[in-house]
């Protein structure tokens, strides 16, 4: 298994697939899966390539989900090991995407290969949902594939997302949910004027201060067993012309909430609207919902993954819902149990991104054992 995982990971890393350009990564994976008897379906949307591959039939449907796109490298001269050469030094595989998440993809593919070779007539269905649009807009990737599958009445029962979930050691963290994310783009109206004649103008910054104080101090909820309390942060504020003698005519405030399952996005929107009305502000607001929160409570999938980590890696993981959003939020809409397990995340999106070769091999064995636990 070791040689296959590392070789595939290196071949994927050597393709500079900066989002949403797949650079042939999915074709490489599809060719391997097709040799095993997987049915291959391409789902291109605009400039994004997506792959839906299946082996077997019936329930349960176990999907491996991941992305071939990577974030830009930044200044390549800052890299000790070039970002697309996939060098191995002292058990570390270097390159953009090594941890996020071409290493996981390689481990998933080889784990499935090993399982299908040993169990060609396995129960249920093993599937792959792979996109090249996770790191950027996330508009034409997993979300579009999920919409297509749901429209056809297809179902995913269990989904393993290979995002780099681990913190200090491989498998110490398993993500069994994620907070929702909603952004408000708020424009508060004023009246432009000269700072020496404030009675002839209306300063939207001054008017908005009491509202902003209430907004930032508001306690949305207390969280629960699986989620921390909902958090609001102001991300951007802009007003004025840049001149020191002009009262601004408009104030722009952008804020984001990472919210738990105790509240809904509708509750958040209604609460903000009530605050704005209370403070008598003239405004317009545009909302952008990046994703609703989801939670996979301990059950078949969580138990299978925890058991796999304990038996293969000797690690008892902590279940966690922290961090940003992932494509798991879209797959959860299908009613699937979703967890995320992947390599250490300490170097993702950084210069000299890297992953332990030993960890990738272990990860492949864990994914394989998960299939055994769910299908045998």
UniProtKB/Swiss-Prot annotation:
Q: Where does Zn(2+) 2 bind?
A: 100, 135, 349
Q: Where does Zn(2+) 1 bind?
A: 67, 100, 163
Q: What cofactors does this protein use?
A: Zn(2+); Co(2+)
Q: In which pathway does it act?
A: Amino-acid biosynthesis; L-lysine biosynthesis via DAP pathway; LL-2,6-diaminopimelate from (S)-tetrahydrodipicolinate (succinylase route): step 3/3
Instruction: Supply the PANTHER family for this chain.
Output: ACETYLORNITHINE DEACETYLASE, N-ACETYL-L-CITRULLINE DEACETYLASE
Q: Which gene encodes it?
A: dapE
**Catalyses which reaction(s):** N-succinyl-(2S,6S)-2,6-diaminopimelate + H2O = (2S,6S)-2,6-diaminopimelate + succinate
- Functional description taken from the UniProt entry: Catalyzes the hydrolysis of N-succinyl-L,L-diaminopimelic acid (SDAP), forming succinate and LL-2,6-diaminopimelate (DAP), an intermediate involved in the bacterial biosynthesis of lysine and meso-diaminopimelic acid, an essential component of bacterial cell walls.
The answer to whether keyword Glycosyltransferase applies is: no
The similarity annotation says: Belongs to the peptidase M20A family. DapE subfamily.
- The catalytic activity of this protein is classed by the Enzyme Commission as 3.5.1.18
CDD domains xrefs: M20_DapE_proteobac
What PROSITE patterns does the database record attribute to this sequence? ARGE_DAPE_CPG2_1
Please give the Gene Ontology molecular function terms for this protein.
acetylornithine deacetylase activity; cobalt ion binding; succinyl-diaminopimelate desuccinylase activity; zinc ion binding
GO terms, biological process: diaminopimelate biosynthetic process; L-arginine biosynthetic process; lysine biosynthetic process via diaminopimelate
Instruction: Write down how the cofactor binds this protein.
Output: Binds 2 Zn(2+) or Co(2+) ions per subunit.
Source organism of this protein record: Actinobacillus succinogenes (strain ATCC 55618 / DSM 22257 / CCUG 43843 / 130Z)
Task: Note the Gene3D superfamilies from the entry.
Answer: 3.30.70.360, Zn peptidases (3.40.630.10)
Designated name of the protein: Succinyl-diaminopimelate desuccinylase
> What keywords sit in the KW lines?
Amino-acid biosynthesis, Cobalt, Diaminopimelate biosynthesis, Hydrolase, Lysine biosynthesis, Metal-binding, Zinc
Residues of the active site are 69, 134 (proton acceptor)
Quaternary structure and partners: Homodimer.
